[in-house]
Amino acid sequence: MFMSAKTKFLLITGLLTLIFTITAEAQSVNEWRGNGRTGIYPETSLLKSWPAAGPSLLWESMEAGTGFSSVTVTDDAVYITGRKGDDDYLTAYSQDGKVKWSTRYGKASDSNYPDSRSTPTYSNGKLYLVSGSGDMVCIGTDGKVKWSVNYFQKYNASAPRFGISE
């Protein structure tokens, strides 16, 4: 049983395309603690040990407010939540540390450990988060609120003793 030259060419081209597509796929972290939620990241070219004085500080900011949020990093921004006064804010920074925008997304919790605790979840150009007082919010990468709902009000529920932290 023989294959024609055209069939061989199409088969080899298809296999090479599949192989290069699979191996060229960019690493994307779409879950908490990385792919598979293991906390293990397969990056290469990382330092084997830290310099004695530690890594150099690229930038810092005190403009986000107070809280316990982790950052969410995308290709073009760094997002973090923080409490300012009685409200929770989502702040977007450029990769060089300049504030792009800051958007109020709900009232902060007044319960124990009252500062912001919500780490933004990023998916397809939108950020999802929840305020300390139960406001579930979707914010675009332009800082505009797409939708918001307070689930304590919607479901006639009371706030938990220690507020909300997802």
Describe the residue ranges of each PLM region.
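Bacterial N-terminal signal peptides that target proteins for export
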Residues: M1-I12
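Short, intrinsically disordered, low-complexity terminal segments
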Residues: F2, T21-T23
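Bacterial N-terminal signal peptides
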Residues: L11-T21
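Noncatalytic, solvent-exposed loop/strand surfaces
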Residues: E25-E166
